Amino acid sequence: MMMLSKSLLSAATAASALAAVLQPVPRASSFVTISGTQFNIDGKVGYFAGTNCYWCSFLTNHADVDSTFSHISSSGLKVVRVWGFNDVNTQPSPGQIWFQKLSATGSTINTGADGLQTLDYVVQSAEQHNLKLIIPFVNNWSDYGGINAYVNAFGGNATTWYTNTAAQTQYRKYVQAVVSRYANSTAIFAWELGNEPRCNGCSTDVIVQWATSVSQYVKSLDSNHLVTLGDEGLGLSTGDGAYPYTYGEGTDFAKNVQIKSLDFGTFHLYPDSWGTNYTWGNGWIQTHAAACLAAGKPCVFEEYGAQQNPCTNEAPWQTTSLTTRGMGGDMFWQWGDTFANGAQSNSDPYTVWYNSSNWQCLVKNHVDAINGGTTTPPPVSSTTTTSSRTSSTPPPPGGSCSPLYGQCGGSGYTGPTCCAQGTCIYSNYWYSQCLNT
């Protein structure tokens, strides 16, 4: 997800005796491999369903990790995406989790109890609960540090980060530290170069060259696991010309998925932030599946969410993904859970809470459909339901007006009711959005 509230999770209450006793029995596990445009997970080739749980990496109570993973696994989900980064520039207060402190005078990778040892337990628990993890190394956004923390330490900006020698040297040191800890763990589904990498206004060659070099480096460290980019799928010539299909954010999905040292493609979908309607997402899935099919690799629909009527609007995306050649799996944003002490996990408007009606629709029903069950997701509504921040139709290709709050791809746009071509007066940095002025 692009932007999350910044919060470092503090310690929770101790585990109950019952939770300590009820330990799952892990099945025989193996490294994930690829078979055509699908994945082989522990000897079974097919389509998988998964979720995102970025906050799982920062839980200090092991019982909370175990209960969350128990709920995810028992729901039939196979893969969980967790953050593998937590970058800071100054020493946090005691008890707060941080993985890396970045400084031009000497950076520190935290392997202590308030550092990578918390991620150690996440990997251990995933092994126990028969789950696989996708772990990104850096965030494009400033949540949990991200590229901005590197910029604070080594200078430059978010676009020069990809070619900044000092920043890239430290990034690779961190990659090596993380990969070396888990290179032999069958709980790792894939290493991810970053969460939603962008290079606004850059040639798409910048990210292609960076992704090629870094993915080759990761492969040199670990030949057991898959590697992927972690991009949103922005930049694709086969779409309708709406903002997400354009190349202003410096990414070219078709080029990226063709990189030999990347094993599969990823893409995300957020109509509420992109100025598109919900049904538009079905075509977005199909065009990316076609690009992956052309590359001979699987696509993973890695993040998606709808702020309004999630069951009605997201279930058709799941059906489209499941039934489209080239798709290997999907992972909704994001999992929500309640811990033994009654506290709830971090959440946002897209959260699907365990045991909720949306969980029944988007998790249990979807898993049943994958496993050949008879559960039928709700049909696409005959009338398009959109957020108040969403246009009823995608922005017209090459037009002079994009919907209010629709992303304008970094170009100069302004206007009281829509993004009209001109000079940008107020832009939302996080989502490249044209806002009301």
Curated annotation (Swiss-Prot):
SMART domains: fCBD. The active site is at E196, E303. It is found in: Secreted. It catalyses: Random hydrolysis of (1->4)-beta-D-mannosidic linkages in mannans, galactomannans and glucomannans. Its EC number is 3.2.1.78. Residues 20-27 form a propeptide. Residues 372-399 are annotated as: Disordered. PROSITE patterns: CBM1_1, CBM1_2. Glycans are attached at N157, N184, N277, N355. Optimum temperature is 75 degrees Celsius. Endo-1,4-mannanase that catalyzes the random hydrolysis of (1->4)-beta-D-mannosidic linkages in mannans and heteromannans. It is a crucial enzyme for depolymerization of seed galactomannans and wood galactoglucomannans. Active against locust bean gum and ivory nut mannan, releasing mainly tri- and disaccharides. Also has transglycosylation activity. Transglycosylation of two mannotrioses into a mannohexaose is the major transglycosylation route. This is Mannan endo-1,4-beta-mannosidase A. It comes from Hypocrea jecorina (strain ATCC 56765 / BCRC 32924 / NRRL 11460 / Rut C-30) (Trichoderma reesei).
